[in-house]
Each structure stands twice: as C-alpha cells, then as structure tokens.
C-alpha cells in the first residue's frame, strides 16, 4: 500500500503544480487560467445522457472583421466540444478552445496580445484597446451561462471582478502579457 500512497501523492502534487499554471504552446502563446475546480471527485463509471452544446452570439461590438473572427472561434469551439454530459467540463473546454482559436487566427498580431473569455464582471484600463467583444450564451440542455469573449490590444489591463478557474476564465496571450495569480488579472504592455 505504500507504493499506492506514493503514486497518489505524486499525482496530487502534479495536479497542484498544474493548477493556475501558464500552459505554453509551440507557437509561443500561453493559455492562462486559475483552476479552482475540485478534480479529486471523479464520476467513475457513471453512465449519463450526452447532449450537444449550443452556442449563441447574443451581442457583438467592435470592428466587423475582428468580431467575425471571434464569432468563428466560438462556433469552432462548440463544434470541437460536440456532445458532452458534463456542463462544467464543457464550459472549461469552451473557454480554452475559444481563446486558443482566436489567437491562432489573430487578425493583427502586432496589436492584439491576448484573447479572453470570462463570465463574471470585469473592467479594463483602456476600453478603446478591446475589440471584437461578443456576448456568448453557452447552453447544455437546460443549463446555460454567458461569456464575454474579446481581443485585448496592448497596452491594457483586464481586471477580473469574480472568481477564475477554467470554468469562468481563459486568457491566451503572448509574452507581452503577464497573469497575476493572486488577482487573476492580465496586464499587456
């Protein structure tokens, strides 16, 4: 049993290291989150009904070209997620997939240093340096929530006014941005 205890401790340690980590990609972009969801509770072999994720763009503001790219990223994320049975897992996949797709299709890499999706209250230092902001409804069966997804141009700061975690927040950004683990805020220079 001692070896099993060591394996469990090692896995838990690795999990703690990953939580709140910056995940580097081969293209030099980083997806940053503040993961707070309890991953120790597994569903085991529970069978459940799988349902398709539906996404609706509620409102959009910004230049037409940039807003179109945000909307395409949102649609691609919904297609990528497909049919799922867990609302929280779907939300986590949605936030990460959307911001990564947005940055992979960045219309102006010199200007836009980050993509964000967040479903809590937020503010920014310079609203003029936000583009493509879209209000998105994420729905699975009777459960739903909404997100704001947008590009962040530098210089700017994105201030979170709620909790983080992949379920609520994802930033994909260049090295010109830094993520504050304590506040879950992003600063781009």
Where in the sequence are the language-model features?
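Generic N-terminal initiation segments characterized by hydrophobic and/or small/turn-forming residues
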Residues: 1, 26, 31, 44, ...
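Fungal secretory targeting signals
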Residues: 1-54
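Intrinsically disordered, low-complexity segments enriched in small/polar residues
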Residues: 11, 18, 26, 40-42, ...
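Compositionally biased, intrinsically disordered low-complexity regions
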Residues: 15, 22, 30, 44-46, ...
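Membrane-inserting effector segments that mediate pore formation, membrane fusion
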Residues: 52-93
């Amino acid at each position: 049993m001692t070896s099993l205890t060591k394996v469990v401790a090692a896995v838990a340690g690795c999990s703690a290291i990953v939580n709140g980590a910056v995940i580097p990609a081969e293209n030099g972009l980083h997806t940053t989150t503040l993961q707070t969801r309890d991953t120790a509770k597994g569903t085991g072999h529970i069978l459940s009904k799988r349902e398709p994720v539906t996404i609706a763009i509620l409102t959009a503001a910004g230049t037409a070209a940039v807003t179109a790219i945000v909307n395409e990223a949102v649609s691609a994320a919904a297609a990528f997620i497909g049919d799922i049975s867990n609302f929280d897992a779907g939300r986590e996949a949605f936030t990460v997939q959307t911001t990564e797709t947005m940055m992979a299709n960045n219309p102006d890499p010199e200007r836009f240093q980050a993509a964000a999706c967040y479903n809590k209250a937020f503010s920014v230092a310079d609203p003029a340096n936000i583009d493509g902001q879209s209000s998105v409804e994420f729905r699975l069966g009777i459960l739903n929530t909404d997100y704001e997804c947008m590009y962040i141009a530098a210089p700017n700061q994105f201030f979170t006014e709620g909790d983080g975690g992949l379920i609520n927040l994802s930033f994909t950004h260049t090295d010109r941005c830094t993520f504050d683990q304590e506040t879950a805020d992003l600063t781009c220079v």
